[in-house]
C-alpha cells in the first residue's frame, strides 16, 4: 500500500517538471498540475537545494516500480547542470526553469544549496559506488568549496560561509559550548578576535536542528571515538533541560541567555532527524548499517542498491 501511495503522489508531482528546461517548479497544484516558484526566489528561479535533492527518492521509486520515468527526470537535471557554466566551479543557488539560466551567481553550501551537494555523494553511495559521474561532480564541488568558501579566523579556526555545514564538527562543538545553553545558534560568524559567535539577534535561536548530532553519529560509526557519544549525550541533556515543554519540545530564541524563551514550535525534523540520530548514536552498528543503507536529507533510510540484492523487487534494467 505504501508503494501504491508513493506512485500516486509521484504522478501528481510529475507535472512540476513540465517546464521548457525540465527543471521543476518549486510547487505544484496537485489537482490542476500547475506549477510555480516562490515569489522571493531570484528572477522567478527554482532553487538548487530543491530540484537538486530529488535523486535518491526518484531513483528508488524507479527501482521499486520498474518505471524509468522518475529516474529519467532526475538524470535530466544532472545532465543539464553538467552543461552549465559554474562560477568558481560551484553551482549557483537559483536557476530559471524557463530560460535555463542562473537567476544570479550566489553560491553557498548553506540553505538553498546544501542538500544538492549532499545528494551527489549519496547518489554514489546508493548506487553501491558505481555512479562515478555523481562522485566526480561531488569531488569537483568539494575541491571548489575548499578553494573558495573556506577562510580562517584570527585564531586559526576554519569557517565555511554557510550556516549548516556538517563537516567542520569540531568547530560546531566549539560554538555549542560557548553558549549558555550548550546548544548551537542558527548561524555564526568570526567577528574580529571573537571566535564563532552569533552576531545578530536573528541568528541566536535554536529550533531543534539535527545537523550537528547527525555528524556526531556519522563520526561515531566511522571512528568509534567515545567523544562523539559524549558530545551527543551533552546535546541530549541540553535539549531535555531547555527545550522540553508540557506538550513536547520547543525551539529557543536565544542560546546565549541563561533564561531562554521558547518559540512554541516543534519542528517536524525534530522527530524525523534529531531524535532519530540521537537514538542511532547510542545504538549498535548492526542497526541500519551504513554499507546497506543511505539516509536521505530528512533522515529517511533508503537501501543501497547492491547488484546481488534479491530482497527488493526492483527492475534489473534500472539497477
Predicted stretch roles:
Residues 1-319:
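Glycan-recognition and catalytic cores of secretory/periplasmic carbohydrate-active enzymes
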Amino acid at each position: 500500500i505504501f508503494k501504491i501511495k508513493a506512485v500516486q503522489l509521484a504522478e501528481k508531482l510529475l507535472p512540476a517538471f513540465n517546464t521548457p528546461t525540465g527543471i521543476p517548479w518549486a510547487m505544484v497544484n496537485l489537482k490542476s498540475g500547475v506549477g510555480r516558484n516562490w515569489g522571493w526566489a531570484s528572477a522567478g528561479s527554482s532553487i538548487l537545494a530543491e530540484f537538486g535533492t530529488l535523486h535518491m527518492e526518484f531513483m528508488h521509486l524507479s527501482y521499486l516500480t520498474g518505471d524509468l520515468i522518475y529516474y529519467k527526470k532526475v538524470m535530466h537535471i544532472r545532465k543539464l547542470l553538467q552543461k552549465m557554466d559554474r562560477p568558481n566551479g560551484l553551482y549557483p543557488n537559483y536557476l530559471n526553469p524557463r530560460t535555463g539560466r542562473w537567476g544570479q551567481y550566489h553560491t553557498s553550501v548553506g540553505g538553498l544549496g546544501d542538500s544538492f551537494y549532499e545528494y551527489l555523494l549519496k547518489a554514489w553511495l546508493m548506487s553501491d559506488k558505481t555512479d562515478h559521474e555523481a562522485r566526480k561532480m561531488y569531488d569537483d564541488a568539494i575541491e571548489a568549496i575548499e578553494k573558495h568558501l573556506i577562510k580562517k579566523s584570527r585564531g586559526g579556526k576554519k569557517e565555511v560561509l554557510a550556516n549548516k555545514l556538517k563537516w567542520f564538527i569540531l568547530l560546531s562543538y566549539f560554538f555549542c559550548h560557548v553558549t549558555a545553553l550548550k546548544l548551537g545558534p542558527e548561524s555564526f560568524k568570526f567577528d574580529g578576535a571573537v571566535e564563532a559567535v552569533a552576531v545578530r539577534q536573528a541568528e541566536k535561536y535554536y529550533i531543534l536542528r539535527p545537523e550537528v548530532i547527525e555528524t556526531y553519529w556519522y563520526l561515531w560509526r566511522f571512528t568509534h571515538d567515545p567523544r562523539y557519544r559524549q558530545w551527543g549525550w551533552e546535546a541530549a541533556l541540553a535539549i531535555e533541560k531547555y527545550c522540553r515543554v508540557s506538550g513536547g519540545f520547543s525551539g529557543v530564541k536565544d542560546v546565549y541567555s541563561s533564561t531562554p524563551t521558547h518559540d512554541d514550535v516543534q519542528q517536524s525534523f525534530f522527530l524525523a532527524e534529531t531524535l532519530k540520530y540521537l537514538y542511532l548514536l547510542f545504538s549498535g552498528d548492526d542497526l541500519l548499517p551504513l554499507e546497506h543503507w543511505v539516509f536521505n536529507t530528512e533522515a529517511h533510510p533508503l537501501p543501497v542498491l547492491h547488484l546481488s540484492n534479491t530482497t527488493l523487487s526492483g527492475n534489473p534494467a534500472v539497477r
